[in-house]
Amino acid sequence: MLYATLSLARHIYNQLMEEALLGGLSPQAFLRRHWQKRPLLVRGALPGFGGAITKSALCALAARGDVESRLVERRNSRWRVTHGPLERAGLTRLARSNARNWTLLVNGANHHNAQAEDLLRRFAFAPQARLDDVMVSYAARGGGVGPHFDSYDVFLVQGKGRRRWRLAKARPEPRPFSLIPDAPLKLIAGFRAEAEVVLEPGDLLYLPPGWGHDGIALEPCFTYSVGFRAPRGAELAAAFLDHLHERGLPDAVYRDPGLRPAARPALIGPELTAFAEAQLARIRWTRGDVEEFLGRYLSTPKPNVVFTGSSRRGIALSRCEAILDSKTQMLYRGARFFMNGEVLRPRPAQRAALARLADDRRAPGRMLARAGLERLILEWHRAGFLLLEAGP
């Protein structure tokens, strides 16, 4: 109930709010001038922003098995990374100490914290298939994760405290930054900053993919990283072949009834090579296959995501508001809708209601019921994919 109350108002795209967030730029102007082109610094992008989570709550999340977390410590020039789940008592002692040069990072904080989810939805001008999550970092004085670069766009929003960012322009492919070998983090070797900026509470810094950045806490501070999903071509290709295989990819077995004794046992024969080539040539797919794969792939939850189902019965959908759970990803393409990795082909009369639920992440129960979706919505509610709260 608390989550729905806190998050309901911000799931709808609001251009005025986005212009304030982007320093007076409209989303269109920001995308044209800055997106994947050059950084943007906005002072006071979120006036009065004190953060979305407390230090104690972040430590509690880092101790959970269903949450991805890391503790990064630097001693002199040596780095140590401890992956979660982390021991809560030890984290609490560390957080209360005067130790410096350490950082606690929690990925997917928006799945467990309503205000972090609100922050993510402030970037609703980007397609939901591209929005990833909010990573929250708490750093003691001197803490950071070293100079690095990301392959995706990121918005860095400063919570409590101050952090200095050292920046370097992206290196064009195929010669990106070199990395320090054998380091526990992907650290840029010989990093040379070309600019520096200090973020204070409520400030926002956008960085395009590939920009080198090194954030160092000037005092104990929180930073909220709104990251974007950027699938790699090889990753998509491998997943697509798995998708085709599940749906009946040709699966012939190699046979060689005319096999003769091998004069050179280690040599791969031309017959086996020809067989492999022929099987690959038989693979066929349509645009529809690609669209279905992409929808399922982009809406599939990460492995550590767990939904909490509801056992409520006797719910009158027409009196409720349906609100997607923060962990739910609902997308659509044409006549296909995708809910957490599953595909749905609704009747034409049902598509508008489902599209509103997907786009706004909420929809009036009356509208869904009139579209004949009551049974489906209640199934999703029992699975924990969405919440049903009393309507206005």
Task: List each model region and its residues.
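Helix-loop elements that line ligand-binding/catalytic pockets
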Residues: R232, A238-S318
